Amino acid sequence: MRIEEFDYELPEELIAKYPAVPRHSARLMVLNRKDQSIKHDTFINLPDYLEEGDLLVFNNTKVIPARLYGRKPTGGRVEVVLTDFIKPDEWKALIGGKKIRPGLVIEVAPDFKVEVLEHIEEGKFRVKLLGEEPLKLIDKYGHIPIPPYLKREEEPIDRVYYQTIFAKEKGAVASPTASLHFSEELLEKLKEKGINFAFITLHVSYGTFKPVKVERVEEHRVDPEYVKIPKETVEKIKETKEKGKRVVAVGTTVVRALETKPFEPFEGWTDLYIYPGFKFKVVDAMITNFHLPRSSLLILVSAFAGREFILKAYREAVEKRYRFYSYGDGMLIL
């Protein structure tokens, strides 16, 4: 398949620059794969489309303030954006400026430095964080790396709303955005209906914003990301399936995590790239946001629901002035 087949026209003003407040006030488009119907609703009414015994699987990763500002030994200012978690004190990073070489030490603060270990490719490096408890130092000195297409600086609202309410495991540099719509009030409504919850961890990397640059979509590769699927989550998934109920993945990160090692507890790395033709073994339904044209995420949802149906839904979303991307509205695919 050609990448042009995953393109669509999006007016700039439909890119959501700020989050919906409250979270559950975002709009919800409901796609039914069986009858190819499209309905329009609001996220607070999500329980109306789920059944008692269905299982919602969330990504509990926590976005770290991965944008760091420091100085080289010469005194020159430099920006470091941590892009890929390797371990708490080791990351891949984008570093701006010239003369960035292995051995360079960038001072973020007297108690926090970044050492360049290896040049990976143009502008990208492997780095070591120097200081006690690096994740705490990132929290102290870093800035939230809001998506580049927002075209604005980080604001206080982003510290709250670019994080899910169940964010727990530090390591993501981008939010698992489908989960941003869930408020305490919505979770209570879901519990009252008998909907069950489970969690995985996938540390979303900066690669989530990477456009597909190859002509044939089958040749694209996604960056490896750290994933952990606990035994308890696998057991809940199996129980749900045995009862004939649905496993609902909240976000493309959860889809990729669950389909990497179906029905197995797992901790490691996934570079699973899902495109049309993929056979889904675990996921029965999916909640997701509206994705960028020509992106691996749009290709993934097309694999799940069919390219033509998805593009028809996107055209309708544009007509009805839905809000797009990370802070935008959402979609439930049944």
Swiss-Prot record:
Reaction(s) this enzyme catalyzes, per UniProt: 7-aminomethyl-7-carbaguanosine(34) in tRNA + S-adenosyl-L-methionine = epoxyqueuosine(34) in tRNA + adenine + L-methionine + 2 H(+)
Domain of life: Bacteria
Keyword line: Cytoplasm, Queuosine biosynthesis, S-adenosyl-L-methionine, Transferase
Coiled coil region boundaries: none
Enzyme class per UniProt: transferase
GO cellular component term of the entry, any: cytoplasm
Location in the cell: Cytoplasm
Main localization of the protein described in the UniProt heading: cytoplasm
Enzyme Commission number(s) of this protein: 2.4.99.17
Gene Ontology molecular functions: S-adenosylmethionine:tRNA ribosyltransferase-isomerase activity
Pfam families tied to this protein: Queuosine_synth
Disulfide cysteine pairs (residue numbers): none
A Gene Ontology BP annotation from the UniProt entry: tRNA wobble guanine modification
Keyword Cytoplasm on entry: yes
Pathway: tRNA modification; tRNA-queuosine biosynthesis
Subunit structure: Monomer.
Role, per record: Transfers and isomerizes the ribose moiety from AdoMet to the 7-aminomethyl group of 7-deazaguanine (preQ1-tRNA) to give epoxyqueuosine (oQ-tRNA).
Similarity comment text for this entry: Belongs to the QueA family.
Name of the protein this chain belongs to: S-adenosylmethionine:tRNA ribosyltransferase-isomerase
Annotated organism of origin: Aquifex aeolicus (strain VF5)
